[in-house]
């Protein structure tokens, strides 16, 4: 992936090759400027690669987008302040002309799933940052995607809220059984969430390591104190230092 800036060419991603299995939870991990968000945007058909091939459930990113194969959650919740929580969740279903009764049924199910069943009539500005991101996750799941793409969704939250939402996200993932591709620059977050961690290095962005995470599931906060958890963090950190 290349682009031009101020008269010079920048190589954002170079010879990146990876494969994610159905139902797998993987993280794209790396420092700022390593191309992890660019890679996610290519998967989401928000940016076009200058070379190479990308397949989403056997389809091109554009075909996957048009057939509602994936949902996406950004760093910012991107909610509409003039729409209620429930109306924000039903928005993609309205765009698909799903009948109102079905829209409401799905929204009610998702509100319960993300723990916001009592907040359906609230507005985004009445919610905390963590609650807003839960609404964004519910909206992404409204179309029942096979794949959930997440671009550092918890990076703006405090550490306590972030760790709690990590655990809640895994509970949601267990129920929906979608494939998740999660972008983060936090090593502990990647280890806690993932089946595998794809480590990207910068200048140009490239895949430098793939680390299996053999921690048992379900994962709980107590695992953050486990020696194996710290060993995996150290292993990944050593991979960065070796780049």
Report the location of each language-model feature.
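Short coil-to-helix segment of the ABC ATPase nucleotide-binding domain corresponding to the Q-loop/switch region
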Residues: 83-90
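Helix-to-loop junction immediately C-terminal to a conserved catalytic motif
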Residues: 44
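Conserved signature/switch motifs of ABC ATPase nucleotide-binding domains
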Residues: 122-125, 143
């Amino acid at each position: 992936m290349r682009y031009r800036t101020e008269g010079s060419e920048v190589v954002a991603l170079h010879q990146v090759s990876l494969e994610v299995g159905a139902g797998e939870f993987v993280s794209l991990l790396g420092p700022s400027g390593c191309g992890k968000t660019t890679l996610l945007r290519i998967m989401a058909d928000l940016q076009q690669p200058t070379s190479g091939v990308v397949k989403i459930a056997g389809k091109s990113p554009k075909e996957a987008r048009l057939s509602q194969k994936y949902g996406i959650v950004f760093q910012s919740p991107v909610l509409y302040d003039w729409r209620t929580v429930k109306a924000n969740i039903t928005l993609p279903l309205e765009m698909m002309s799903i009948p109102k009764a079905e829209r409401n049924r799905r929204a009610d199910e998702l509100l319960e799933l993300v723990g916001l069943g009592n907040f359906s009539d609230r507005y985004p500005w009445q919610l905390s940052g963590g609650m807003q991101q839960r609404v964004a996750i519910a909206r992404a799941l409204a179309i029942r995607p096979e794949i959930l793409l997440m671009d550092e969704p918890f990076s703006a939250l405090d550490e306590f809220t972030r760790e709690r939402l990590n655990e809640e996200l895994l509970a949601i993932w267990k129920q929906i059984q979608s494939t998740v591709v999660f972008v983060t620059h936090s090593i502990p977050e990647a280890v806690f969430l993932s089946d595998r961690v794809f480590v990207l290095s910068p200048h140009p962005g490239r895949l430098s390591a793939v680390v299996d995470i053999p921690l048992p599931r379900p994962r709980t906060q107590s695992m953050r104190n486990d020696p194996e958890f710290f060993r995996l963090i150290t292993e990944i950190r050593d991979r960065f230092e070796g780049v």
